[in-house]
Structures are given as structure tokens and as C-alpha cells.
Amino acid sequence: KHYIGLHNESTNKKAAKAAAFVCFKPATVYGGEFFIADGERIFRDLDPAVIKELYEKQVRISAVNLDLDVLGNLPGGFKETAMDKATELVDKTIIPKFDMDFELIWGTDGNDMRLQAIEEVQSPVNRHPDTGRPAWFCNMHNQARFLRDRRPCAVPEVGMTDIYFGDLSLIPGEMLSHVNKVCEDNIVHVPMKAGDVLLCDNYRVLHGRDIFEGDRLHAVSWFGDEKADVADTGGKPGDVLNNLLNTFLVGK
């Protein structure tokens, strides 16, 4: 059982303009409802002081945790050398599989022997490419560990995401709670039966999925892939972050 919070699909490199969500089979026991929210309404409803601070400080998303505590047992200079080699290995073999720019950093969350892949600094607000209107364009509701720890989450530690200010300082819990409340106040559940298709504007509409039990089969097709002018929030169409972690590990 895993709750997928509100998110857009994009990276600092690409963003899909639209998506078609298709239901082939609803959950056979219960749950699994698809839900959406209007990014313009979220932007409008957020406390202006919160928006101002997040916009000025920007945000960064940690996407992958590699716990390498075994290296901590090495003596003296061997430890530092091993950490450097581990960073180099991950940078050359794993990071290229992502169509994203990551910085590999040790110990951001206080665990000295944890190597994290952290996205570039990005804005929590974007302007729609056609209308020019501002909208909340941030995966905080889905990727903040503070929120994930307070709802059903089946993601293993290696894929446990988190979100920080642009300088990698912690975002206060009260700010995350406020964003969570505004997001959830704007959620609209979309019950779908087999054969239903939902078209969404990815620049304006965030989407997520409730917990479920039983078998469930949905799919999504992205179109209008283009370069993104504004740094985003967590995963391009079909990327490893949202589709590996949400689909293969927890069942999107």
C-alpha cells in the first residue's frame, strides 16, 4: 500500500505538455483512485509568505539514497579514498541512466555515510508556456520525506526522496504541513472504470494516486515533449524516479 502524492512529470531538461491517463482495470479490492489538482489554485491558495520564501530560496530534490556504512569502518585515508571511488563509480555508471542532472553529495540528511543523488536547484513555481500564468509546479507533496513518513509509503530507503531549500537546508515541518494542506484541499478524485481516459495539461495539473488493494492496471501516454525553461521537480515522462520508484517498486 503506497500513496503517491501530487506531482508533475518533468525535469530541468524536459517537460511533457499533456498526458492521457488510461484505466484498463480498476483495483479489484478497493482504492487506487486517481486524483488531480489545479496548480494555479494551489499557487493562489498558498500563504504568500510561504510562496515568497520558497521562490526566493528555490528547492532541491534528493532522489536516491545509497547507504555505504561499510566504508565507514575503513581506517584513516582508506575511508576517504573509498568514498571518492564510490562517488566516481556511481557518477559514471548510474547517473547517466537518468535524463537529469544530479550532484552526488555525502551526508546531506545527517547520515555521514549516505551518498545522495540530488537534483539541481529549481523553482517551485512555473509559468504556463501558452498562457503565461503562474502555477505551483513542484513535487513537494509527493517527495517530502516529512509527509511520506506520515502516510502509507512502501518505497525502500534507496528510493526515499526528500526536498530541501536550494542551499540544502531543511524546509520546516510547518511549511511542509501548510503546503500539504493546500494541496489536499485542492485534490479532486477521479473515479475511473475500464476504458476511461483522462487528458491532463501537465503544466497546470498535478496528479497522484491513492492506496489500493488487489490488482490494478493503469497506463499513461505523454506527448508534447519539449525543453523546459524553468527548473522543475522530479521526473521526466517515463523517467526512473517516478516510474521506477512508483511503478515497479510500489505499483503506480
What is each PLM-predicted segment?
Residues 2-6, 14-197, 203-252:
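Active-site environment of non-heme Fe oxygenases that use a 2-His-1-carboxylate facial triad
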